[in-house]
Amino acid sequence: MKFIIKLFPEITIKSQSVRLRFIKILSTSIRNVLKQYDETLAVVRHWDHIEVRAKDENQRPVIADALTRIPGIHHILEVEDRDYTDIHHIFEQTLEAYREQLEGKTFCVRVKRRGKQDFNSQDVERYVGGGLNQHIESARVKLSHPQVTVNLEIENDKLMLVKARREGIGGYPVGTQEDVLSLISGGFDSGVSSYMLMRRGCRVHYCFFNLGGAAHEIGVRQVAHYLWNRFASSHKVRFIAIDFEPVVGEILEKVEDGQMGVVLKRMMVRAASQIAERYGVQALVTGEALGQVSSQTLTNLRLIDNASDTLILRPLISHDKEHIIKVAREIGTEDFAKTMPEYCGVISKSPTVKAIKAKIEEEEGHFDFSILDRVVSEAKNVDIRTIAEQTQEQVTEVETVAEFDADQVILDIRSNDEQEDKPLKLDQVEVKPLPFYKLSTQFGDLDQSKTYLLYCERGVMSRLQALYLLEQGFTNVKVYRP
């Protein structure tokens, strides 16, 4: 079988040296992706296209599908090579190949020609089209919007019958631009922004700020692995996880409520910038869209940018949520995003939409930056190729209850502000406040002869924290969902 790979049009207008470099990188990417299906396949570079030849016919569907997901490819033609002697011979072979497909249909013939022949493309279109019209009584020619387009390619003394055409995702080949680090949360925005930079030729590494224990990290790892495996498996990338709970705890205790959101984002940018510098990455990528939430006003985005000298790319800055979700659906990350947890521990009750630099710097003056340095130094760096095996491990399920016994203790793990706004008052049971960001350090000090039921408003943070405690060896925890 043979595939003709047509280049993304922007590649074809580059200078000769740049064009050749892009084609070489794309050829290598194609070979890296497809070798898992057929190690004997051949990838041949040409000035205006790339040929892929494979021997195993059983792999035709998966190879064709994989090609549609490699950045840099405009479309793919599945072709059958044949010899020809003259223009009439071309017609005879086309009639043989297309007769059944054209019966009762409108059609047109489109020809692309390379090399030296004694006819031009229009000659072939007229001759073959007229012949098909005469020999297939139920078919008729229609040059605009036909039901079937008969595509032929002629190169020197070879005729290529186009059996199928598939659209690619376009863009530049991965690796033609420099590396970036995507701040991924597993939601709609960060997945789409990562995809858009991959499609623009960047090798995208992933940085995840963990606020919810191992269960949340496993979910985000799955999203990152899916994006890499689907659109950029030709290149090795990193997945870096940073335990950010200590940072959140410090912010909740030391920073004024209205400034928390901007300060948290600035801390994330600082941490990600250190990671980027460590691995020689040129820019950060976020899924922020102008005005979507309080921290994403122009004023606040500018202050967030000022936290670091590292370039921050925001490919979704002018996109609305509906369009972002549509793209997530198209690339296959929608289901991941819909099930990704949103935490009950809201970082700020009354966030500012127009932060003042002096005020932010004053609040950050109360922050212990040694905590930020520590979590960055302890960041976990994983080769994304190993994630597939790791995520197959089952996350231990924690028991959820709607009722309690008198000898059990309800742990209200919401933030202090949430507890003040909506106090949890229950009769015949002890209710003990212990914010989620203190659980990892203070749960071990509690009376371990008792069973603790973790409570938060939506039940997501409580479940993830219970999973984390189970992983640490504590078996006396459940989730309370009244």
From Swiss-Prot:
Active-site residues from the entry: C456
Coiled coil: none
Annotated compartments: Cytoplasm
InterPro entries: Rhodanese-like_dom, Rhodanese-like_dom_sf, Rossmann-like_a/b/a_fold, ThiI_AANH, ThiI_fer, ThiI_N, THII_Thiazole_biosynth_dom, THUMP_dom
Enzyme Commission no: 2.8.1.4
Record-linked CDD domains: PPase_ThiI (cd01712), RHOD (cd00158), THUMP_ThiI (cd11716)
Enzyme class label: transferase
Keywords: ATP-binding, Cytoplasm, Disulfide bond, Nucleotide-binding, Redox-active center, RNA-binding, Thiamine biosynthesis, Transferase, tRNA-binding
GO function terms (MF aspect): ATP binding; CCA tRNA nucleotidyltransferase activity; tRNA binding; tRNA-uracil-4 sulfurtransferase activity
Domain named Rhodanese: residues: 404-482
Cystine pairings recorded for this chain: C344-C456
Reactions the enzyme catalyzes: [ThiI sulfur-carrier protein]-S-sulfanyl-L-cysteine + a uridine in tRNA + 2 reduced [2Fe-2S]-[ferredoxin] + ATP + H(+) = [ThiI sulfur-carrier protein]-L-cysteine + a 4-thiouridine in tRNA + 2 oxidized [2Fe-2S]-[ferredoxin] + AMP + diphosphate; [ThiS sulfur-carrier protein]-C-terminal Gly-Gly-AMP + S-sulfanyl-L-cysteinyl-[cysteine desulfurase] + AH2 = [ThiS sulfur-carrier protein]-C-terminal-Gly-aminoethanethioate + L-cysteinyl-[cysteine desulfurase] + A + AMP + 2 H(+)
THUMP domain residues: 61-165
UniProt xrefs under SMART domains: THUMP (SM00981)
Family according to the record: Belongs to the ThiI family.
Protein's job: Catalyzes the ATP-dependent transfer of a sulfur to tRNA to produce 4-thiouridine in position 8 of tRNAs, which functions as a near-UV photosensor. Also catalyzes the transfer of sulfur to the sulfur carrier protein ThiS, forming ThiS-thiocarboxylate. This is a step in the synthesis of thiazole, in the thiamine biosynthesis pathway. The sulfur is donated as persulfide by IscS.
Name used for this protein in its record: tRNA sulfurtransferase
Organism annotation: Serratia proteamaculans (strain 568)
Protein's gene: thiI
